[in-house]
């Protein structure tokens, strides 16, 4: 039986799903309904009353369009479709009244409010309100909350829409915000005055329709109309969240989420949102050469000449690909190093990932598959630290009835999970069981780097792949590096390469700051920040950060995405691919591309699937050879969410958040 229902909205008859609310039906008809409390990704509260519409033939009063479904409408005379009016005199009068009530206690802070220029209350007061107020009584005042270093509160501006409460409870999975009191005495507050303990809390800034919750680090720095807005991709984890980079002059002022149903919906992690101050600190803005044990500033010809001299004289040459390197730079490095007889490696954490089997390193599931899964298994991972937005999607599936199982040490998750066991050998035990019942349900297995960086990582990956095959589950590999899948796609690996790198006498380090390079080798470091890699370098070539050059990144599910340049690199720093092209000229082996466009053409010619931007290819590959899984508990490789890369480690705000997280953990252990 069809669930489609006919309905007449402002004189236009349309056919919609009966389960839709009236506000959704109006959107289907192309009619915008004002709202404050309603949000399509949160539960329905129905408390702002701004979305009132007139239902002809219904009760003689306006109806809240966010809370009434189409199937509940009474048909018209002789079975005619129900009629809805969104712009009748009754509706206009109701909206004016609601707006007047909302503004009764609202302060006239617009000139000094950070929300000014992008405020729903401003826009809707202009569109649906009146130009005078009948209220002559004193306005109420409330104390501001201390929610931590990220969210600044101005609670006199709050209209009690409860979006922040619903987000923290339903999506972030914490219960530290709530509403107390009734009527004029109602207010949003935190539990016992606690600061928020979530790495997704910054999203309540976007959700707040007024200026009650604003960004504390961004406060009073810029107005929305002063900013240049650029669509790009996040690289703080391997999910590849869609983001907007707002810049003022040459500086990045803030990051905001963009809607992408297949990846991040419209949420981003706090590291993604607030790491921008790390782009301003500890930057490499000029080349350096080490002489007599100390680094000195050099010119580009000097630095490139010194690097070329070392490469030409190398008996064993190796290249390392860091966690934030775009595909273009990785592809260029591979051609440069292999052209000089060297090897290139992107698996700098020792992950046992086969570069010739895309189904094994990019998985067979999509992020979107998690939403519909009835069973989810986590192997050697803590998604709350490794990919907070992915963790929110797992929580979303859990709230819809999915069962979550964990193999490995039990992490502190935001949902209930069945701890199957900590030992990796449990995978072998599970393979011996009958999975016919599970195979009938949609399910996803998520494997983390905590499992794959072990010495038996290849055996664990083969076991997880076999388990996915037995249960007819999708396999998702949760990488911790944004560059990893793209680097594997272009073949930036080599058998036994980590052993070869240990023996190399010249190492070209493309932003790999997460490993220690042994003494003795001559190190050429190309990167954006003065982090661990730069401290070990003999030559430093300053490169652009991810907001300062166009770059291709492939996320954990194998989706190619483009990061767009939003600003320019500081000082004499250059785009990463251009540095490698210039160095190839010094080596008399000039790479065959002289622009970013020609480089991308070469990449797509060699790897056609990378030309399908924002599409997830169906990953294929042979079953991996089974190996012996050793005893031992699986643990996550990420222990400090806020300090996982050089940009984050340069951020003062990330350092503060890291210290706060450690203090909370210490307090919790002391309480036990």
Question: What residues fall within each predicted segment?
Answer:
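Short, glycine-/polar-rich solvent-exposed loops and beta-turns at beta-strand/coil boundaries
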Residues: 38-47, 69, 182
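N-terminal export/assembly segments and adjacent metallocofactor-ligating motifs
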Residues: 2-27, 35, 39, 55-58, ...
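Long, low-complexity segments enriched in small/aliphatic residues
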Residues: 597-672
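Structured interaction patches on ligand/partner-binding surfaces of diverse proteins
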Residues: 66-77
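Non-catalytic alpha/beta scaffold blocks inside enzyme catalytic domains
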Residues: 348-613, 665-672
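Acidic, glycine-enriched active-site microenvironments
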Residues: 8, 51, 66
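Short acidic beta-strand-loop surface patches of small beta-rich interaction domains
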Residues: 43-47, 52-59
